[in-house]
Amino acid sequence: MGGPKKEENPPGGGPTSLFILTEDNPIRKYTRFIIEWPPFEYAVLLTIIANCVVLALEEHLPGGDKTVLAQKLEKTEAYFLCIFCVEASLKILALGLVLHKHSYLRNIWNIMDFFVVVTGFMTQYPQIGPEVDLRTLRAIRVLRPLKLVSGIPSLQVVLKSIIKAMAPLLQIGLLVLFAIVIFAIIGLEFYSGALHKTCYSLEDPNKLVKEGESETPCNTDNILEKATGSFVCNNTTSMCLEKWEGPNSGITSFDNIGFAMLTVFQCITMEGWTAILYWTNDALGSAFNWIYFVPLIVIGSFFMLNLVLGVLSGEFSNERNRVERRMEFQKCRFRAMFQTAMVSYLDWITQAEEVILAEERTTEEEKMHIMEARRRNAAKRKKLKSLGKSKSTDTEEEEAEEDYGDDGYLKTRSKPQGSCTGFWRAEKRFRFWIRHTVKTQWFYWFVIVLVFLNTVCVAVEHYGQPSFLTEFLYYAEFIFLGLFMSEMFIKMYALGPRIYFESSFNRFDCVVISGSIFEVIWSEVKGGSFGLSVLRALRLLRIFKVTKYWSSLRNLVISLLNSMRSIISLLFLLFLFILIFALLGMQLFGGQFNLPGGTPETNFNTFPIALLTVFQILTGEDWNEVMYQGIISQGGAQKGMIYSIYFIVLVLFGNYTLLNVFLAIAVDNLANAQELTAAEEEQVEEDKEKQLQELEKEMEALQADGVHVENGDGAVAPSKSKGKKKEEEKKEEEEVTEGPKPMLPYSSMFILSPTNPIRRGAHWVVNLPYFDFFIMVVISMSSIALAAEDPVRENSRRNKILNYFDYAFTGVFTIEMLLKIVDLGVILHPGSYLREFWNIMDAVVVICAAVSFGFDMSGSSAGQNLSTIKSLRVLRVLRPLKTIKRVPKLKAVFDCVVNSLKNVVNILIVYILFQFIFSVIGVQLFNGKFFYCTDESKHTSAECQGSYFKYEEDELLPKQELRVWKPRAFHYDNVAAAMLTLFAVQTGEGWPQVLQHSMAATYEDRGPIQNFRIEMSIFYIVYFIVFPFFFVNIFVALIIITFQEQGEAELQDGEIDKNQKSCIDFTIGARPLERYMPKNRNTFKYKVWRIVVSTPFEYFIMMLIVFNTLLLMMKYHNQGDMYEKSLKYINMGFTGMFSVETVLKIIGFGVKNFFKDPWNIFDLITVLGSIVDALWMEFGHDDSNSINVGFLRLFRAARLIKLLRQGYTIRILLWTFVQSFKALPYVCLLIAMLFFIYAIIGMQVFGNIKLGTVENSITRHNNFQSFIQGVMLLFRCATGEAWPNIMLACLKGKACDDDAEKAPGEYCGSTLAYAYFVSFIFFCSFLMLNLFVAVIMDNFDYLTRDSSILGAHHLDEFVRIWAEYDPNATGKIHYTEMYDMLKNMDPPLGFGNKCPNRLAYKKLIRMNMPLDDELRVQFTTTLFALIRENLSIKMRAPEEMDQADMELRETITNIWPLQAKKMLNLLVPPSDQLNKGKLSVGKIYAGFLILESWRSTRFGQLDSGMPMLELQDASRHPSQESLTGADAGHLHPGHSYMNGHRRSPSLRHNGSPLARSPSPRRRGHQYIHHDIGFSDTVSNVVEMVKETRHPRHGNSHPRYPRGSWSASTSPARSPSPSRYGGHLSRSKRTQLPYPTYGTTSLCQRSRSPSPARLQEMRERDRLGYGIDMGVTHVQHSYPTLASRRAGIGRRLPPTPSKPSTLQLKPTNINFPKLNASPTHTHHSTPHSVHSLPHHRDLLRDPRDMYYSSRERERDRERLRDRDRDRDRDRLHEYDLRYEYRDRERELYERERDREREVERERLEYIAPLSFEQALAMGRTGRVLPSPVLNGFKPKSGLNPRHSDSDEEDWC
C-alpha cells in the first residue's frame, strides 16, 4: 500500500534501512517483495474493511456500558493491532524509517498508519484511562481505501478537480475567514454579554420564567426605559437579571472571539441565524440589529460561499476537458495505428486478388465470386457506418429496424422444408403486418394514452378512499399490467428480441413491467406495495418525442449518461466521506448524547443512526442543533467547544465542497448538452438550406410544376419564420431608440383617423419626454402608499387617507390608459394597445382597481363581496412592474429571467414528473401512517379519547390536556399532499422531522414507534440524491448558463467577447492615479513625505493593524477590571499611533493631496472615530442616555479593512468582488420588486393573524403587520429558515388579531398560503438567488481559467505602476519610460523583464500609439493598445488594419454610446494622428527592431580596428529631466537647429504624409516615393549612438568642398543643413566633459564590410571623406524632383500582424548597438529628425553624389593600389574571424564586385520597399541573399549574447 513503486529505489546502490540492512540484504529483499506483492495489499485492505465493520457494529450505551456483542468485538482489537503492526514493521524494514527519500515516514499514508498503530498500543494500557480515548484515531484508517480509489479514472476527475480547486479555494477561504473575523469583532464589541439577561421569577430568584417553551433574553424591567422592539419581563411575576448562561446553554453568544466566530459562521451557513437575530432584538432592541445580520447573510452566504461553487465548477470542467482530450488523443493514436495496419493488409489482399484475376487459369466463376465478395464487403462497410451514426444517441425507438431490409431479415431465418412451408409463409406475412402496425402513429398514441390512464389511476389513490375505488384500482392494475405485457410481447414477436432490446426505451419498458409483475406477486404473498408500478409514468417522457424539446432533452440525457461515471464516483466519494465521519462521530459522541430532555433523535449511538445524522449535517439542515447537542454532551460551553471543529469540518467539506461538485457536474453537462443541441440545430438548418437550393434548381428546370410549388412553399417556411424573428427584433430595437415615434397609420377604434386632432393630441402627450418620468413618479408614490397601509386595523384613519390617494393614482393610470388607447387603438391592428403584454397588465390593474372602487361606493351586500374586493385590490401590487418596461437595463435582466424560465420549461416538466413519481411511491409507502395521538402512550384513534395529564419540566402540578388524533402537518395521504411534503423536503427545510416520522410510521391508522423501520430512510436518501443534489442543481445550472449566454448574445453583434468587454469597460473608466511628491527636496515636508511613502513605514503600520486586531480579539465577557483597563489604555496607544500616522501623512502630502486618496479619507474617519470613542470611554459615562455612541466602536474594527489592500491575490479577489456588485444593481432591483410585491400581498392577506408564541411561527418578530416586518419575514424565507412552519401558521382557520375588527368566530389566514409560499420559494431559491451565483461565476471565472489570458482584474496593476512613472497624473509619459514600465510589468499585462527586446519591439510596432510633440504616449491609448494587442481585438493583417480600426470604432460607439463621444479618439487613434507627419511608437520601434536585427548579425559584432558602435549605456532619468535638459531632444521634432536661412526637413515642417507603421493608409498612389516618418526615425536612432574608440578629426578632405550630407540627403531631397555644423563645433570649442555623438548616417557607411573595404573606410576617415566635426559646411544645390515638391513622400508599408523583418541586408548597413530600453541621457546632443535615404541610396558611396567620372576612376585606382600594398600587413587581423579558402579568388571577386557597384547607374526610382522586405532582418536566423557579391556570408548562428532564437517561448 504505502510502498513506492519498484523503479523508485534501484536495488544495490540505495541507502541502508535502519542503518543495518543494505539494498542487497536478503531480509530486506524478501520484505520488499512481500509489501509489493498484490495479495498482501489486498489482505491489508480487507483488514481495514473488517476493522470498519467492527467499528460499525458497536452500539454505544450511556455511561460507558457495553452490550455483549460490543465486549466480544473489543477482543478483536488486539488482532487488528497485531496485523497493522506487522504491516508497519515489514514496511519499515523494506523502506527504511525516515532519513532517506521514499522511506516509510516520507509517505503521508504511512505516517497515518504509524500514528494509528502507536496510539493503538497506548489504548491497550488501562492506566491511560478513558479520558484519552485514542481509539477515535482508528477511524482515520478508513481513509486508507481512498488510495485504491485514486486508480479509478472517473474518480480521479472528481478528486483531481477538488484538489486542483484547493488553491483558489484557500484564497476564498482566506477572504471568508477575514469576513468572519471582522463580523466577529464587531459582534464582540456590540453583543458581548448581551444575551445573559433573562426573566427570573419574583418568588424564586433562581427559577427561570419562559416565554412559550424557551427562555428569552430581556432588555430591562422598566417598560419606559426599554429599547424599541426589545423584550420586557412581566414585572408582576418576574424580573430581568443578568445571571443566565445564555441561549443554547451559552454556546450561542458573542462573549469572546471563539464564541463570536462560531456564531458568525453559523449565521453564514444560514442555519438558525434568525433565532440569534431575534434574541439580540429582545436583548438590545430591533432598531439596528438587522444592519449587522442582513449584510452578514448577503456578503457571507450569497456571495462568499457561492464563490466556492464558481471555483469548483470551473475546475471540474477544466479537469474533465483535460481527461477527455487525453482519451481522445489515445483513441486517435490507436485508430491511426490500426488503420495503417489495416490499409497495408488490404493492399496486400487486393494486389493478390488482382494477380489471381489476371492469371489465365482463373475461371469466370471464380472471378464472379471475388467480385461478389468485394461488393458485399463494401455494402457491409456502408451499413456499419450508417448504424454507427444512429447508434450514437441510443435513445431512438426502433430506428435501426429500417436498416434490416426484408431480404436480409428473411435470409437470417432458417426456412423449414416440407409440409409446414405454407404455415411459415403465413406466419411471416402475419409478422410483417404486426410489425407495420406496431410502427404506426395510432399504435404509438394508443400506448401513450394507456400510460396516461394508468398514471391517473395511480394518482387518484388517497387515504380514506371509498371501497369501490379501491376495488376498481385493484382490477385496473391487472388490466393495465396485462395490456403492457401484451404490448411488450407483440413488439418482441414483431421485431425479434435483438432489435427490440436495441432501443433503450424498450429496455426500460421491460424492466418496469418485470418490476410490476414482481410487485403483484409480492403483494399477494406478503401484502404492502413499493409503488414500483408508478415508474411506468416515466414512459410519459415519450410524449416529448413529438415536441420540439426532444433533441435538447435527449442531449441532456446523453450528456448525463456520459458523466454517469463522474456522478457515481462522486457518490462513492460522498459515501466514503459519510462513512468516515459517521465512524469518527461514533467514537467521539457514541453514548454521550444524554440530555435533560432524553436522547435526541439525531445521535451517534448506532451506526445506521450515525450515518443518517452525518447525512443530515451534510445537507446543512439543523446542523447547528446537532452541534449544540454534541458540545453539551462533552461538557458544555466551558469544556466541549473543541468538539465544534468536527461539525465545522463536516459542513465545510461535505456541504460546501462535495455537494457543490454536483452543481459543477450539472453546469458542465448542461453546457455540453446545449452545445450538442446547437450543433444539431445548425445541421438541420443547413440541410433545409440545401434542400431549398435543390428545390429552386428543380423549379427553374421544370418551370414550376404544381407539386414542386407546394414543396417549395413548405421548404420556404423556415426562412420566413426567421425573417419574422428578425423583424420582431428590429421592432424591439426601434422601441428602445429614443425620439418620438410616428403615429400608426391605422384608424383608432374605427373612429379616430391619424389626422384627427384628438388623436394627435393624445399622441403628442404620450410621447412627451417627461410623460414617462411623471408616470414613474406616480408609480413610486403609489407603491409607497401601498407599503404604508395598516393591514390590521382596516378602517384606521391612515388607511382612509391613503384610500383617497389611491383614487388619485388610479385616476392617473386610467387617464394614461385612455390616452394610449386613443393613440394606438385597442387591439385590431399591429402595434395597438392590447398587443403588448405590459399594456394588458396595466389595463387589468386599472380595471380591477376601478371595479373595487365601484363596489366600495355602492356598499351593497358588503359582506359577500369583501373577499372579491380584497382580491381585486391585491392586484394593485403589480403597479411597480410597470417600471420594468421603462428602464431598458432592468427590462434586459427581466427578459433574461423570463428566457431562463423558458429554457427551464422542458426540464420543469421532467422535474414535475419525477416529483410526481416520488409522491406516488410516498403515498404507497406512507398512506394513512402519519397519524398520531397528542398523548404519546396511545397508538390508535379508538384509544385516543378523553384527557391526559401533561407534566411540565419546572411545574409542580401537571396540566390537563385533551387527547386528539390528528395527522402530521406534512403527510402522504394523497398525491397533492405528498408533492407538497416532498417540495419542503427538497428545499432542505424541516426534512429531518419528516424523516423521523417516516421511520416511526407503523401501519395504517396506527400511531408511531420511534425508529420502527429505519430502512425507510433509503427513500429519502435516494430522493435527496435525485432532487436536491441533482435536479435542483440542473435547474440552477440552466439558469446560470442562460444568464451567461444572454450576456454573451448581446456582445455577439459587436464581435467582442465578455472578457474583452470587461477590459474595455475598465479602460473607459480608468484614470491615472496621482502620486504626490513635494517639489523642494530640502524641506521638512519632503523628509516627512519620504518616511510616509517608504516601505518600512508601510510594514510598520501593517504590524500595528495586526496587533490592533489581536487586541480587539482579546476582549471577553466578565473580564477583570485590571485587564479591561489595560486593554483600554493599549487601545488608546494604538489610536495615538494611528493619529500620528494620519498627521504625518497630512504634513507630507499637504491637505489637498491627502484627500485625493480614498484610503486616506477612510484612515482619517477611522482615526477621528477612534479618538471620539476613546474620549467617550474615558470621560463620557456620566449621562448614558444622552446619545448612543455605540456605533463609534465600529471604527475599531474598521482598521482591519486596511489589511485588504496589501496582498495581491486578496486585492484581485476584492476588486472582482466589487465588480460583481456593480453588475448586480438591476438583479437586486428585480429581487427588490419581487420582495415588494410578495410583502404587500402578505400584508393584505395574512396581516391580521394573531401573533402567537415561538412555536406558532407568526410571532412579534416574524409577521406581516407592517411592510418592514413583511420584508424581513420574506428575507428569512429566502434564506430557507423554517419557511414550511410559517406557511402552516398562515393557513385558514387561524385566530385573528385583537385589533382586527372581526366578527366573533371569524377566522383569519388563507389557503392561498400554499401557493403564496411555494411560488415565493420557487422564485427566490431557484431564480433570484441563482442570479447571484450566475453573476459571481461570470466575474470569478478567472480563478480557474488559464492565468495567461489577460483579464480586467489584471488592469488595476497598470494604473498602479503608471503612477510610479507619472506621479502628477498628467496622463502622459515618455515613450522610453513606457517601454521600461511594460518591461517591469509581469505578463499577461506587461512584457516582463525576461522578454527579449526583439519580441517587445514587435509588440510595440503592432500597438503603435501616437506620440505628442514631446514624444509622450497617452495613458488611455497605451492601456487600450495593450489590451487590444493581448486579446487580439480586431487585430488583422496590416493592410486591413484601417478597416479593422473603423469597425472597432463602430463597435465601441454601439456598445458604449455615451462614453464613446469623449473617449473614442483616445481608444482608437484616428488615422490622421498616425499618418500626417507625426511620429508614432510603431515607427520608432521599427527602427530599433532594425538595429536589433543588425546587431545580431556577424557584422554587428565585429571586433576589428574599425570604429566600433556600441550599445549606449545610458540609465533612465525621469521624463521631466529628460525632456527639459539643456541638450535634450534626440527625437524631438521641435529641436531642429537652424543654419543661416536654411531650414531642416524636420517632421514639423515637412508636409509629406507619413505612413503608419503597422497599417497602410493608401490614397490612390501605387508608388509613393519616400517615407519621412520612418526613415527619419531610423536615421536619428542611428545617430543617437556614442562614438567611442576613434574620435574623428576636425580636418576635412582637401579635395572636396565642405558641404556634407546628412543621412537623409539625396539628390532628390530638399537641402539639409549640417546636423553637427554649428552645434558640434560649439561643443568642441567649449570642451565639454563628455564625448559628443558622431554621426552614423547610413550614407557614410560602406556597402559591405569586407577587409579591404573596411580599410578603405578607415583611410577615408583619415583623409576626411566622412562627416566633419566643427567645420561649417557649404550647401550644394541640385535639381529637386517635382513629385517631392508636391509633398508626396514614399510611404512605408505596414507591419503585418506577425511583424515581418526588414530585407535590408544586415551587411549593407552598419547599425550601432542599442540599449534594450532606448532611453537617452540628458547630455545627449540635440538634432533634428531626418529621413532615411531611399533604399537604392543605401548601396552607394556618399561621395558619388558629386563626383565626376574621372575623379571617381582616379580615386578607385588609388584605393586599389593602397589595398594591394597593405593587404599583406593587414590580412591576419581579419583572418581571425573570416577564413578564405582561396585568397587569389577572393581578391579577384572583391575587385570585380567593386567595379560593378561603382558603375551601377541610378537613373530611376524603383517600387517602394515593402515592409516585409524592410523588416526582414527582424526575423531570427533568416538570411537574405546579399546584394554585395563579394563572397561574404554572415554566420547563420547568432552571438549567444544577443540570441532571441527562442523568442516565441517568452512572454
Swiss-Prot record:
Residues 381-417, 710-741, 1513-1572, 1588-1653, 1685-1764, 1823-1851 are annotated as: Disordered. The keyword ATP-binding does not apply. Residues 1734-1764 have a biased composition (Basic and acidic residues). Residues 58-75, 129-133, 192-288, 461-475, 523-531, 590-642, 787-802, 854-866, 925-1013, 1123-1127, 1175-1184, 1243-1308 are extracellular. I repeats lie at residues 25-316. The chain crosses the membrane at residues 39-57, 76-95, 108-128, 134-152, 172-191, 289-313, 442-460, 476-495, 504-522, 532-550, 570-589, 643-667, 768-786, 803-822, 835-853, 867-885, 905-924, 1014-1038, 1094-1122, 1128-1147, 1156-1174, 1185-1203, 1223-1242, 1309-1333. Expressed widely in the embryonic nervous system. Residues 1604-1619 have a biased composition (Low complexity). The record marks 271, 621, 989, 1281 as: Calcium ion selectivity and permeability. It comes from Drosophila melanogaster (Fruit fly). Residues 395-406 have a biased composition (Acidic residues). It holds the Pfam family Ion_trans. Gene3D superfamilies: 1.10.287.70, 6.10.250.2500, EF-hand (1.10.238.10), Voltage-gated potassium channels. Chain C (1.20.120.350). Residues 1637-1649, 1698-1710 have a biased composition (Polar residues). PANTHER family: VOLTAGE-DEPENDENT CALCIUM CHANNEL TYPE A SUBUNIT ALPHA-1. One of its GO terms (cellular component) is apical plasma membrane. Voltage-sensitive calcium channels (VSCC) mediate the entry of calcium ions into excitable cells and are also involved in a variety of calcium-dependent processes, including muscle contraction, neurotransmitter release, gene expression, cell motility, cell division and cell death. Probably encodes a dihydropyridine-insensitive current. Vital for survival to adulthood. It is a multi-pass membrane protein. Residues 1-38, 96-107, 153-171, 314-441, 496-503, 551-569, 668-767, 823-834, 886-904, 1039-1093, 1148-1155, 1204-1222, 1334-1851 are cytoplasmic. Residues 1306-1348 are annotated as: Phenylalkylamine binding. III repeats lie at residues 762-1049. One of its GO terms (biological process) is chemical synaptic transmission. Residues 1353-1388 form the EF-hand domain. This is Voltage-dependent calcium channel type A subunit alpha-1. Residues 1589-1600 have a biased composition (Basic residues). InterPro entries: EF_hand_dom, GPHH_dom, Ion_trans_dom, VDCC_a1su_IQ, VDCC_alpha-1_subunit, VDCCAlpha1, Volt_channel_dom_sf. II repeats lie at residues 427-670.
